Amino acid sequence: MASSSTSLKRREQPISRDGDQLIVTPLGAGSEVGRSCVYMSFRGKNILFDCGIHPAYSGMAALPYFDEIDPSSIDVLLITHFHIDHAASLPYFLEKTTFNGRVFMTHATKAIYKLLLTDYVKVSKVSVEDMLFDEQDINKSMDKIEVIDFHQTVEVNGIKFWCYTAGHVLGAAMFMVDIAGVRILYTGDYSREEDRHLRAAELPQFSPDICIIESTSGVQLHQSRHIREKRFTDVIHSTVAQGGRVLIPAFALGRAQELLLILDEYWANHPDLHNIPIYYASPLAKKCMAVYQTYILSMNDRIRNQFANSNPFVFKHISPLNSIDDFNDVGPSVVMATPGGLQSGLSRQLFDSWCSDKKNACIIPGYMVEGTLAKTIINEPKEVTLMNGLTAPLNMQVHYISFSAHADYAQTSTFLKELMPPNIILVHGEANEMMRLKQKLLTEFPDGNTKIMTPKNCESVEMYFNSEKLAKTIGRLAEKTPDVGDTVSGILVKKGFTYQIMAPDELHVFSQLSTATVTQRITIPFVGAFGVIKHRLEKIFESVEFSTDEESGLPALKVHERVTVKQESEKHISLQWSSDPISDMVSDSIVALILNISREVPKIVMEEEDAVKSEEENGKKVEKVIYALLVSLFGDVKLGENGKLVIRVDGNVAQLDKESGEVESEHSGLKERVRVAFERIQSAVKPIPLSAS
């Protein structure tokens, strides 16, 4: 492991009540070990880490506190490894709640998950009413689980995440989540010590803003692996030498494989033990070993090097044992049996049969959850209650030799000092052990800049983060570095919490979006001469091209290469253009102009009284037309408090008096453009009257 002198650079995130709120709530494993499930919410995104059950409870009482959340709001559920206390409520959550998000775990975890949970359903001694799920639910859940490779980055609804090797068991992962630039590391169960078949947990290359970390071992320090292995083999050798039997209760997968590797090697080196059988007693024995034989390349160099000659998980001195009926209990033997907590199954049956004989021994090889028989017998009570309800003396020797693949204090403190997270949340530990760990860790970070929190179940931790919004130019826009004051024009594309600016024609290249052109076409009643329209348009617009329609032979105009004005018949004019903001404004002004020309004809025959009234109304409409035409030419046109029109172009301002036509502006170029444009508009919308007054 790297020393603390090589620690990562801490990410300094400004935190205040004004920032975005991030919430972390343990729904399980808060000041306890069991039913790991941690809820996290930030900027409208919701994540669940793990989905386990409590081994000491049954039925609904074993579940995490799912009623504290809305399952339908969860975007992503990340499972760190296959152990019951981290994955066993997943079938229930997927099939019995409103959850419709996505679920991820590693390949090895998914392979073992189904085996382990199918066995869990079979060996559980609970009533039908207390059954949380059945094999059908497990099979359905398999269809919904997606797999992720180590170091593969996945993005779901703006949530980015990837995983690192965690040690602990085959396929175990630590997940790093990134939401809007805020990073959260969830370790799950991890170990920084390489053992006989697993790599040590990796150190992420990024320092997270928050580290949610297990605290199972508290402030305890593990013995060295060699000392533990020697104690383990010495107890077994001495027990069988005096004719006793050795029971090793263990989970079907995980530490069991590590211990089997030790036993097989020890038996190979001691010919005097070859007549004493070793059994791996689990209904899953053969299937489990097949999985381990498949995922050799996911293990450490030691195993992979051995695999070049032979598969190390094809044991020479260990036989599978599927049930108690297949066991010939005569003479000394070593049996590794499931489940590890001695709640039921083969391990409990053998314990009940052997516990009264002082020649026998029981080795507890790892951490045991409160409330289980395995945890109880570590304290060596005089009597135990058997499965049939009777009591029996506990005469067999009980040895606690921890092969727990959980980080001890030395590993945890070193890992955190290398990682340097400003916020640490402790989970997955007994309350007292967790508090001792917190106090000791505070001495490792005396600067006071590190917050360490120990929330209980359903107790939320709230933090606030200010995240900047940055837009990156990509594609053609990124080829040239703009100078200060330059304008960069493009389309802003938001995906999740990232922003990119790109050229419109590169939208399909750098995003999953595609472009489409909307062609607009309208027909307007018009009975006048087409030449009048041409004359008026040329007065207003700088670019008006005349042509003849090839099919009909009727005249047509192209205004600013955007809008086509065509005579459809003696009574109709059509406009056609590809829709965009500028073309839409040009077409609006042309429509207004044509309608205004159409309205001039009735004025010739109006009576004088009606003509005066019409002129007043027409005057208002003319003002609207003038305004629309100015907007189409200059864009930003507003009516000022003094009654003058205020026109802004590229930071320059001009004021236009609608009555006199006078223009005021410090920018001579803009002043002249506005004056000429207004004169052209005036001549187009206020022509010489056809009737003499």
Curated annotation (Swiss-Prot):
Q: Name one GO biological process term.
A: snRNA processing
Q: What class of enzyme is it?
A: hydrolase
Q: Where is this motif: HXHXDH motif?
A: 81-86
Q: Where in the cell is it found?
A: Nucleus
EC assignment: the record states 3.1.27.-
List the GO cellular component terms: nucleus
Identify the keywords attached in UniProt to this record, alphabetized: Hydrolase, mRNA processing, Nuclease, Nucleus
> Which family does the entry's similarity section mention?
Belongs to the metallo-beta-lactamase superfamily. RNA-metabolizing metallo-beta-lactamase-like family. INTS11 subfamily.
Q: How does this polypeptide assemble, per the annotation? A: Component of the CPSF complex, at least composed of CPSF160, CPSF100, CPSF73-I, CPSF73-II, CPSF30, FY and FIPS5. Interacts with CLPS3, CPSF100, CPSF160 and FY.
Tell me the PANTHER family matching this sequence.
CLEAVAGE AND POLYADENYLATION SPECIFICITY FACTOR FAMILY MEMBER (PTHR11203), CLEAVAGE AND POLYADENYLATION SPECIFICITY FACTOR SUBUNIT 3 (PTHR11203:SF11)
Question: Domain description from the entry?
Answer: The HXHXDH motif is essential for the endoribonuclease activity of the CPSF complex.
A further note on this protein reads: CPSF73-I and CPSF73-II are not functionally redundant, but both are essential in plant development. Knockdown or overexpression of CPSF73-I are lethal.
Could you identify this protein by its name?
Cleavage and polyadenylation specificity factor subunit 3-I
Protein source organism: Arabidopsis thaliana (Mouse-ear cress)
